[in-house]
């Protein structure tokens, strides 16, 4: 399966039990900031934004004072799992990022999708990739 198929079929799909509800944008990005696959709607990000996210995975709490920035959008960092998941909120939407051995899985959402639904979609794929050694 191609990386694009993972994004299209496992991240940008309808959320279980909520036909028509799906993430706004999604991507799989290597730890080095290289895009493996992304939805057409995923924002263009700066290398320093990705560096900040990677730093927060290695030093949990790094982004808390400044927020998580992606594609020029600032998200307030909320509870996550140190070294594994970063979650952010902006207005009625937000972002979930799951770190795997080689990649970061991103999901961005807006209402009516809930934070919990975004977390479920992103973390399920991230956990699968971890199980595959990726």
Swiss-Prot record:
Q: Which SUPFAM superfamilies match?
A: Profilin (actin-binding protein)
Which residues form each disulfide bond in the chain?
13-118
Xref: InterPro entries: PFN, PFN_euk, PFN_sf, Profilin_CS
Write down which residues bear the modification named Phosphothreonine.
Answer: 114
One Pfam family of this chain: Profilin
This protein's GO cellular component annotations are:
cell cortex; cytoskeleton
> What GO molecular function annotation could you give as one example from this UniProt entry?
actin monomer binding
Ranges spanned by the short sequence motif Involved in PIP2 interaction, renumbered to the chain: 84-100
SMART domains in the cross-refs: PROF (SM00392)
Q: What is its main location?
A: cytoplasm
Give the subcellular location. Cytoplasm, Cytoskeleton
Could you state what the record's PTM comment says about this protein?
Answer: Phosphorylated by MAP kinases.
Arranged from A to Z, the UniProt key words for this protein are: Actin-binding, Allergen, Cytoplasm, Cytoskeleton, Disulfide bond, Phosphoprotein
Role this protein plays? Binds to actin and affects the structure of the cytoskeleton. At high concentrations, profilin prevents the polymerization of actin, whereas it enhances it at low concentrations.
Q: Which PANTHER family match?
A: PROFILIN (PTHR11604), PROFILIN-5 (PTHR11604:SF25)
- Oligomeric state and partners? Occurs in many kinds of cells as a complex with monomeric actin in a 1:1 ratio.
Miscellaneous notes? The variability of the residues taking part of IgE-binding epitopes might be responsible of the difference in cross-reactivity among olive pollen cultivars, and between distantly related pollen species, leading to a variable range of allergy reactions among atopic patients.
Give the record's family classification. Answer: Belongs to the profilin family.
The name on file for this protein is: Profilin-1
UniProt organism field? Olea europaea (Common olive)
- Biological classification of the source: Eukaryota, Viridiplantae, Streptophyta, Embryophyta, Tracheophyta
């Amino acid at each position: 399966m191609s990386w694009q198929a993972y994004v299209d079929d496992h991240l940008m799909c309808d959320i279980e039990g909520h036909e028509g509800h799906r993430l706004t944008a999604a991507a799989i990005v290597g730890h080095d900031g290289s895009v493996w696959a992304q939805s057409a709607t995923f924002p263009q990000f700066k290398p320093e934004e990705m560096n900040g996210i990677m730093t927060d995975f290695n030093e949990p709490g790094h982004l808390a004072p400044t927020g998580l920035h992606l594609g020029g959008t600032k998200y307030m960092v909320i509870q996550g799992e140190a070294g594994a998941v970063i979650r952010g909120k902006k207005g009625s939407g937000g972002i979930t990022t799951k770190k795997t051995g080689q990649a970061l899985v991103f999901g961005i959402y807006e209402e009516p999708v809930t934070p919990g639904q975004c977390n479920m979609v992103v973390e399920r794929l991230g956990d699968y990739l971890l199980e595959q050694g990726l």
